[in-house]
Amino acid sequence: MVIEQSIYSSSQSTGTAQANLELPLSSPLHLSGRINTKALFSPDNQSQSGGFEFEIGVDEVGRGPLYGSVVVAAAILPKAWSGETEVGLLQDTPLAILTDSKKLTERKREKLFEPVKQHALAYLVVEVPAGVIDEINILQATILGMRVACEQLMVEITKVWRDASELPTAPSTPLGFKLLIDGNKVPDLDEARLATHGICLADMTVTQPAGMVKFCAEAWVKGDARHNAIAAASVLAKVYRDRQLIADGARYPGYGLEGHKGYPTKAHVEAIARLGVLPEHRRSFKPVQQAIEGTLAGTHYS
């Protein structure tokens, strides 16, 4: 099952990033991903209790650049492969070299990209463009991307789970999710929207309707180096964005986007001063603001 979607409103899929956010968004979020329905609900991925509890690793890339989107990815690995990195569950698998994408060379990340997509039970990549970053700020844009990734992947999997015609197991088999978020904070999800799809936060203090799909969420500091599912998401996000910047480097010669990937290097800032601001530059970031105001000359950032 392939996922391809564009979202023009932050409430269309996730609820507002913050209470005073104006809707709709001026630029669309783009979602792309895949669910391997046969593998996802195979007996190999059932828990000892007979149900399914999927660990969804979530990571982002691109908060610091002056140019382009921030990209968030979410990934579910097979149960036998999903766990803390130090346990060594990926040894002798096609993902044996998987770790935090920042510790991998570009060549190794590229080598892992297709195998991660091929062997993941499900994955989703969310692209939050520069226009949205300028509209709601980079922090809220990152949170929004994480919300979309978490919610939409849970919703799509729950839809498949409820469709008995696509499953090798009965749809009454319990289903749950554990969200593993790279960083020190779990984004607030739109629980009202999730409830309309029969998904709720696991809470032992509240009586919940029977048959609800439950989820919990954890923040993992440096999680991309600590958990295989987060590391897989990290590689997907990094390679997706890098490929985008390499393509844009060919579209916009002279800016060096294919090299610095949009980050505020001296060469990038000098190129902006010399060649001008591109549509995908983040106008809310200081060096870009200075270029627009004509005050960038002689100033560089590293």
UniProtKB/Swiss-Prot annotation:
Essential cofactor(s): Mn(2+); Mg(2+)
Residues noted as binding a divalent metal cation in the record, renumbered to the chain: D59, E60, D163
Subcellular location: Cytoplasm
UniProt-listed InterPro entries: RNase_HII (IPR022898), RNase_HII/HIII (IPR001352), RNase_HII/HIII_dom (IPR024567), RNaseH-like_sf (IPR012337), RNaseH_sf (IPR036397)
First-level EC class: hydrolase
Listed EC numbers: 3.1.26.4
Top-level taxon of the source organism: Bacteria
Family per record: Belongs to the RNase HII family.
Protein function: Endonuclease that specifically degrades the RNA of RNA-DNA hybrids.
Name of the protein described by the UniProt record: Ribonuclease HII
Organism for this UniProt entry: Psychrobacter sp. (strain PRwf-1)
